[in-house]
A protein has these predicted regions:
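Conserved functional loop/turn residues at catalytic and ligand-binding sites
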Residues: 5, 10, 32, 68, ...
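N-terminal (or domain-start) structured segment
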Residues: 24-115, 154, 179-202, 296, ...
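An extracytoplasmic/periplasmic, membrane-proximal ligand-sensing/linker region
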Residues: 30-32, 216, 242, 264-325
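N-terminal twin-arginine translocation
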Residues: 1-27
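A ligand-binding cleft/hinge motif common to bilobed small-molecule-binding domains
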Residues: 97-108, 167, 174-176, 203-237
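C-terminal lobe and pocket-closing loops
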Residues: 125, 211-279, 311
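Hinge/capping helix and adjacent helix->loop/strand transition within the periplasmic-binding protein
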Residues: 83-88, 104-191, 240, 253-286
Length: 325
């Protein structure tokens, strides 16, 4: 009798602890959702996150607040999310750096892209274009390569930071073309782009999410684009392959992660609202305006896409010898 009473009490206690958690999942979301962006405000990642967050507010029924936490090749923001409570109220933008590059760039990470995050879904991918200041003497990519070879070490390029897609795109370009161009890292795409426009640094790889308006306005000049086909918004700009640099497709991609252990109903809710946002007219127009390609789908599809990019970039990063620690 005593044993039966003890078991009954334990079962009741377990049920009382599980019930509030189950109700919290059923009521999700019932408070503000914090969206970590591991880059400064004003860059392509930030613009995209704010656009999608605005669309998601309508279906989630809660505010989605952007919290910019730049630094350490996205590792600062990633650490915040990896250690957050897995309740769906802390999510983040995740891109090539976190999901494809950092495991190859750092000897040791405080978290694993595979084990310490819940994959929620993809947002978009967008190609990078090699751009120069309008006053730079090279008019074509062929001219640019010839200038770089004739002036080894005298040409600088900007990037949003060490280990960014823009940084590694140029390093791959250098390896493919046999050129020596010095890296000048910035804290975000916006300040890097400003200095290329101002002529302080002559060139950079620039993602279309941030760069399309300044390319179209003539504030920078695009020599080539790192996509498989030409961008419809820039029909006069050749791809890198068309301009003679083969096997050099370079693009940035974005998706959403949460901490590991997010309950399946929460992941499903966030993924569904994300896909609704990507299908909305406002988000589709904004993406088209910035040369983006939407990446709707399931959490597993996004995870597989990210892992395929990690496998693609691993040998490239190893060949360049770049390390960030």
């Amino acid at each position: 009798m005593q044993r039966r009473t003890l078991l009954t009490s334990l079962a009741a206690l377990a049920g009382s602890s599980i019930a509030p958690f189950a109700r919290a999942q059923a009521d999700y979301p019932n408070q503000v959702v914090r969206w970590i962006v591991p880059y400064p405000a004003g860059g392509g990642t930030d613009v995209l996150a704010r656009t999608v967050a605005e669309a998601m507010r309508a279906t989630l029924g809660q505010q989605v607040v952007i919290d910019n936490r730049p630094g350490a090749s996205t590792n600062i923001g990633a650490q915040i999310v990896a250690t957050a409570r897995p309740d769906g109220y802390t999510i983040m933008s995740a891109d090539n750096a976190l999901l494809a590059f950092n495991e190859h760039l750092f000897g040791k990470l405080a978290f694993s892209p595979e084990k310490d995050f819940s994959y929620i879904g993809g947002i978009s991918r967008f190609p990078l274009a090699l751009v120069v200041n309008p006053g730079f003497e090279a008019q074509t990519l062929k001219d640019f390569i010839a200038y770089a070879k004739a002036n080894p070490g005298k040409l600088n390029y900007a990037s949003p930071g060490n280990g960014s897609p823009h940084h590694l795109a140029m390093e791959m370009f250098k390896a493919r073309t046999g050129t020596f161009i010095t890296h000048i890292p910035y804290r975000g795409a916006a300040p890097a782009m400003q200095d290329v426009m101002g002529g302080q640094v002559p060139c950079m790889f620039l993602d279309l999410a941030a760069g399309l308006p300044v390319i179209q306005s003539g504030k920078v000049r695009a020599l080539a684009i790192g996509s498989a086909q030409r961008a419809s918004q820039l029909p006069g700009v050749p791809t890198l392959a068309e301009a003679g640099v083969a096997n050099s497709e370079v693009f940035a991609f974005q998706g959403i992660l949460g901490p590991a252990g997010l309950p399946a109903p929460v992941v499903s809710r966030l993924n569904g609202d994300l896909n609704k946002a990507l299908a909305s007219a406002a988000v589709q127009k904004r993406m088209a305006d910035f040369g983006m390609e939407a990446l709707p789908g399931t959490p597993e599809q996004f995870r597989q896409f990210a892992r395929s990019e990690a496998l693609r970039w691993g040998p490239i990063i190893k060949a360049t010898g770049i390390k960030l620690d």
